[in-house]
């Protein structure tokens, strides 16, 4: 298992609010919690930034972290990430903040310590562009959206 440096920015993390952990041995994501002093009501269509009370430094440029919505919050309540997916670069060292968007029909209240997003670590390949005049021919060519049909 890869070690990632984490800094606790809010003393409640690790005491009142558990540190992120994998729920099962097969879990891909670590749940991130709302490190709030008071509940925050999010009206339909509203967004807000929610602190996690944590900072990470991945340090390894071959890794990045991605913040993703929790499936139950999105499906049952319309609560997703305001930026859809959050990307954490390996050299970022600031607090993890979660952009939360209520795309649902009803107001939703985020409680202090509530699990509101999940974070996964992914491999990164930094590419270098090779300028060419033309590409080698492929079966697909320039076929874009919907080119292969629906069935």
From Swiss-Prot:
Q: Which UniProt keywords apply?
A: Hydrolase, Magnesium, Metal-binding, Nucleotide metabolism
* Annotated signal sequence range: none
GO annotations under biological process? dUMP biosynthetic process; dUTP catabolic process
What does the record give as cofactor?
Answer: Mg(2+)
Enzyme class, top EC level, equals: hydrolase
Q: Known SUPFAM superfamilies for this protein?
A: dUTPase-like
Which reaction equation describes what this protein catalyses? dUTP + H2O = dUMP + diphosphate + H(+)
| Pathway where it operates | Pyrimidine metabolism; dUMP biosynthesis; dUMP from dCTP (dUTP route): step 2/2
* Molecular function as annotated in GO: dUTP diphosphatase activity; magnesium ion binding
Give the binding site residues for substrate. 70-72, 83, 87-89, 97
Functional summary from the UniProt entry: This enzyme is involved in nucleotide metabolism: it produces dUMP, the immediate precursor of thymidine nucleotides and it decreases the intracellular concentration of dUTP so that uracil cannot be incorporated into DNA.
By what name is this protein known? Deoxyuridine 5'-triphosphate nucleotidohydrolase
Tell me which species this is from: Escherichia coli (strain K12 / DH10B)
Q: Which gene encodes it?
A: dut
